[in-house]
Design a protein with these regions (language model features):
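Short, well-formed alpha-helical segments that are part of the catalytic scaffolds
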Residues: 13-29
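Conserved donor NDP-sugar-binding/catalytic core segment of glycosyltransferases
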Residues: 94-123
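A conserved acidic beta->alpha catalytic loop
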Residues: 41-49, 89
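Glycine-rich, basic loop-to-helix element that forms the pyrophosphate-binding segment
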Residues: 61-77
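Short beta-strand/loop segment that forms part of the nucleotide-sugar
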Residues: 33-43
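Conserved short acidic donor-positioning loop in nucleotide-sugar-dependent glycosyltransferases
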Residues: 13, 41-43, 64
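Short aromatic/hydrophobic "clamp" motif used to bind/position activated sugar donors
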Residues: 82
Length: 134
């Protein structure tokens, strides 16, 4: 059975923050939880694509705009569960246990998980949303 989780990260000029974000996903990859990491990119001209490629993530070109990028990533995702994560956000160490617990105890229900760390705390836009595709 394939890993259940597709991680979708909308990006635009995210090279500075992306390495921390991707590194925070490693426990999930090591635990066999992550099926794929998809970067839905709105036209980055920095090293975003190179960083994603080096980490084994897939780049999907999208129209610019957070909603459009999230929708593009969701359409391309193959996982049973989707995790949306902003590039300037990194997950805390316990995220794998929290996600696994939710999947086991609340199948079919959307969830919003905290805490997370902002790479740039002055930005308050970061959010993490996890939901199951029916």
């Amino acid at each position: 059975m394939p890993a259940p989780l597709s991680v979708i990260i909308p990006t635009l000029q995210a090279a500075e923050d992306l390495p921390r974000c991707l590194a925070s996903l490693m426990p999930g990859a090591e635990a066999g939880l992550i099926r794929e990491v998809l970067l839905s990119d709105g036209g980055s001209r920095d090293a975003t694509a190179d960083i994603a490629d080096a980490a084994g993530a897939s780049i999907i070109q999208s129209e610019r705009g957070r909603g459009k990028q999230l929708a593009t990533g969701a359409k391309a995702a193959r996982g049973e569960w989707l995790l949306f994560l902003h590039a300037d956000t990194s997950l805390t160490r316990d995220w794998v246990e929290r996600v696994r617990d939710h999947m086991a105890n609340a199948p079919g229900k959307a969830a919003y998980f905290t805490p997370f760390k902002l790479c740039k705390p002055r930005r308050l836009m970061a959010a993490l949303l996890l939901f199951k595709i029916s």
